[in-house]
């Protein structure tokens, strides 16, 4: 192990694996280590017995739930936007050849006490039961504006500069009501709070366009895709990619201790008495706990069920977003469901997650609005985990630390962190203008 590397990556979570893959493709000499004997870190996938051990402290799950190996339960389940930056990143690295994707059946929102399909096009707005007849017309006009908006063509701007006009001002022009603003902001543009209303509308409009483009791309009923066998496939695919480019992976390396010189700059990592030298470190918060601070907690429920989530048109894979205002909360709640159709559970079984930024110490009570939507469950587990963000200055110590995974059930915030870290590490922007047909496996 006594070798020199440009970058040592610690932890095989999704963010670390994507960065390791991107750097390898750039020709950077990478050593990738993990203290665990499995891939994925906090974002790993568990079989049924592992799930049981983690949440019940028992070695074996009851037999009536089916074979343990037929379960691939992602600890950080997140759907990918079909046209989004993560899919583009996967294509950029050519890691898609190791993965198979399948479209997600449904995209829903909880508004006015009901689970409803998210309309994202003028046609869908007119059919939606979310709105009354006049609101449908107003929303249809707004969606048409968004659909036709082209940054480079002023004729489509309707006399507005969206880098100056706020989202609130743009929406006011179309006279949309509070519930419509809620589902557009949180279930189409995928904002996690309401700050976007006072920010330039350009970002929200581009997010809405991404949703509609992703929806059109797979001619599906949702804009999302998900790998067969779950997200646990991603870290392993990146490990294979890294090996192709000469990167080295080492699992089960205890006490990966980061070493610094007198000036506080990183010089290497020691494990089992051997030190590998490096110029830069990329890691998750658990490897450098004195360079991060706690920023909150996520409450989550994981359920095993024998039916789809009610009121989702029998969707075998689905996301339901509950905007914060609908529950008088400060943060949105997310419901995620996947099943045997994505090979994450045995035939007839569904895995559901409910997650949110914790505002109390009681996940069971706090998550009730989400767990109530699930219908009867075979089993349910509740837990909470802390979230951390880096407080170090990477230009001084050469340590690049990811932020803990948030409560969202889509990848938009995760990939934003990855791309920002990539720019900090390399000093360049990642070019994501790729041929999207390379991920067409999802259309099967």
From Swiss-Prot:
Q: Which InterPro entries does this entry report, sorted A to Z?
A: FAD/NAD-bd_sf (IPR036188), GDP_dissociation_inhibitor (IPR018203), RabGDI (IPR000806)
Q: Could you tell me in which tissues this protein is expressed?
A: Expressed in roots and floral buds.
Using the record for this protein, list the coiled-coil segments as residue ranges, or answer none. none
Molecular functions (GO terms): GTPase activator activity; Rab GDP-dissociation inhibitor activity
Q: Which Gene3D superfamilies match?
A: FAD/NAD(P)-binding domain, Guanine Nucleotide Dissociation Inhibitor, domain 1, Guanine Nucleotide Dissociation Inhibitor, domain 2
User: Which BP terms does GO give this entry?
Assistant: protein transport; small GTPase-mediated signal transduction
Q: Which UniProt keywords apply?
A: GTPase activation
The record, for SUPFAM superfamilies, names: FAD/NAD(P)-binding domain
Q: What does the record give as the function of this protein?
A: Regulates the GDP/GTP exchange reaction of most RAB proteins by inhibiting the dissociation of GDP from them, and the subsequent binding of GTP.
The entry sums up its family as follows:
Belongs to the Rab GDI family.
Q: What is this protein identified as? A: Guanosine nucleotide diphosphate dissociation inhibitor 2
Look up and give the organism this protein is from: Arabidopsis thaliana
Q: In the record, what lineage is assigned to the organism producing the protein?
A: Eukaryota, Viridiplantae, Streptophyta, Embryophyta, Tracheophyta
